[in-house]
């Protein structure tokens, strides 16, 4: 029987050189390992990432308290449990913590254990993780959101918006879509060089040059699509897709430039322009009418429900509106958003909520209510590629895992190539069918 014999945690480093938690789960006949990611722009409603706070060690970012919680409290509680009982394991983890935001033991401690248990169970069952979680119907490779140009909190430049992404929607296989993304990435690098702009990359592998405006960022990306030999779509209000190979996705991370006292969106890094909620929604409406934008994530701030409603009413029928800081992978906040009719998609970050079971519950709630799900990395990543497995397991249809550089990002893309190969003729790449707008 696959009884848990030992749960071991250690402190490792993520892609930004900051400590994070890695967990090994051992049973009598299997093994699972998971490393926990960490965000730079984090929502205030996220589960708590437990840090040591000792400024003399790793600038206060150590995770030895979380590691100790795994090696003592959690290890003692899980010893002897069936590793295949994921729901019961996650229930026990939540009860051991006992707080609504996982602040006692740390969401980073709980998540590492939860994912490592799932991996150990999959190994015991002789199945890849995507098949163990998703069953025989798990066969959809996700359309990637490829973050090729960075601004905001992810880059030291003068661009307010955090991520400018390409989505290769006009292809019949994941491998062809990945090739498109790589070629556009290299075309963008050459384009930036030709203009004397920096090709240094941000946290997620996208370029981070100083530009004249936020508009220049999206225009450079569209130009690079053409230079790579692909066709960008038209604005969605003009028919949009046709025979397009690539559409644009944005993550402005609007909470990062929202002033809660003034109730204004302030473009602090560029023009200094100040917009209220209605004006910010109109700003995105204008962009969606001007550029081939298929998806906007966090177009409004995390608690600006009124702004979200205005934005959804304006463009929600033709643009995917993804809630990240708004929903934080939390079924309670998602249910609230569904009731209010705001957004039409949820970003899924496993470390925002803290257990695999809660993650799957959020995805299921979204599906049952016509919302799409985008499985996502964090800006602080590791070589762990679990989210690639989860994307296929849930048939989510979309994944957001950075640019076409940095091995912590490529680990996920390459894992999806392996899964596509394993699925063979069963593999499905949805392209534009991944969207419901």
Curated annotation (Swiss-Prot):
Its EC number is 4.2.1.11. Keywords: Cytoplasm, Glycolysis, Lyase, Magnesium, Metal-binding, Secreted. Its cofactor is Mg(2+). GO terms for biological process: glycolytic process. It comes from the Bacteria. GO terms for molecular function: magnesium ion binding; phosphopyruvate hydratase activity. It catalyses: (2R)-2-phosphoglycerate = phosphoenolpyruvate + H2O. (2R)-2-phosphoglycerate binds at residues 162, 349, 378-379, 400. Belongs to the enolase family. Catalyzes the reversible conversion of 2-phosphoglycerate (2-PG) into phosphoenolpyruvate (PEP). It is essential for the degradation of carbohydrates via glycolysis. This is Enolase. The gene is eno.
């Amino acid at each position: 029987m696959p009884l848990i014999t030992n749960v071991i945690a250690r402190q490792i480093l993520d892609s930004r050189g900051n400590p994070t938690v890695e967990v090994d789960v051992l049973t009598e006949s299997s093994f699972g390992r998971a490393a926990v990611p960490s965000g730079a722009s984090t929502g205030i409603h996220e589960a708590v990432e437990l840090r040591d706070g000792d400024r003399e060690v790793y600038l206060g970012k150590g995770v030895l308290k979380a590691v100790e919680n795994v090696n003592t409290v959690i290890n003692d509680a899980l010893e002897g449990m069936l590793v295949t009982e994921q729901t019961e394991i996650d229930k026990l983890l939540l009860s051991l913590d006992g707080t609504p935001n996982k602040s006692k033991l740390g969401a980073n401690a709980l998540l590492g254990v939860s994912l490592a248990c799932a991996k150990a169970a999959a190994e015991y069952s002789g199945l890849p993780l995507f098949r163990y979680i998703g069953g025989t119907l798990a066969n959809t490779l996700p359309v990637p959101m490829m973050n090729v140009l960075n601004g905001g909190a992810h880059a030291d430049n003068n661009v307010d918006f955090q991520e400018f992404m390409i989505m290769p929607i006009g292809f019949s296989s994941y491998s062809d879509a990945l090739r498109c993304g790589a070629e556009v990435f290299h075309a963008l690098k050459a384009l930036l060089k030709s203009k004397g702009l920096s090709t240094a990359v941000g946290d997620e592998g996208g370029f981070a040059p100083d530009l004249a405006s936020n508009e220049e960022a999206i225009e450079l990306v569209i130009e690079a699509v053409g230079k790579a030999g692909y066709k960008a779509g038209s604005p969605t209000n003009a028919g949009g897709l046709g025979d397009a190979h690539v559409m644009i996705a944005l993550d402005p991370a609007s909470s990062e430039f929202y002033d809660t006292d003034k109730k204004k969106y302030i473009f602090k890094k560029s023009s200094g322009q100040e917009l209220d909620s209605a004006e910010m929604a109109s700003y995105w409406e204008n962009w969606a009418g001007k550029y081939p934008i298929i998806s906007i994530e966090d177009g409004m701030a995390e608690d600006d429900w009124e702004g979200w409603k205005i934005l959804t009413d304006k463009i929600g029928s033709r643009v995917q509106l993804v809630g990240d800081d708004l929903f934080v992978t939390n079924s309670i906040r998602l249910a609230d958003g569904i009731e209010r009719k705001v957004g039409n998609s949820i970003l899924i970050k496993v470390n925002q909520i803290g257990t695999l079971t809660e993650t799957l519950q959020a995805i299921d709630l979204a599906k049952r209510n016509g919302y799409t799900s985008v499985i996502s990395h964090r800006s602080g990543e590791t070589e762990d590629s679990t989210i690639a497995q989860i994307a296929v397991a849930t048939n989510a249809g979309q994944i957001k895992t950075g640019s076409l550089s940095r091995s912590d990002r490529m680990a996920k893309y390459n894992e999806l190539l392996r899964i596509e190969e394993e699925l063979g003729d069963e593999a499905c790449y949805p392209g534009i069918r991944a969207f419901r707008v």
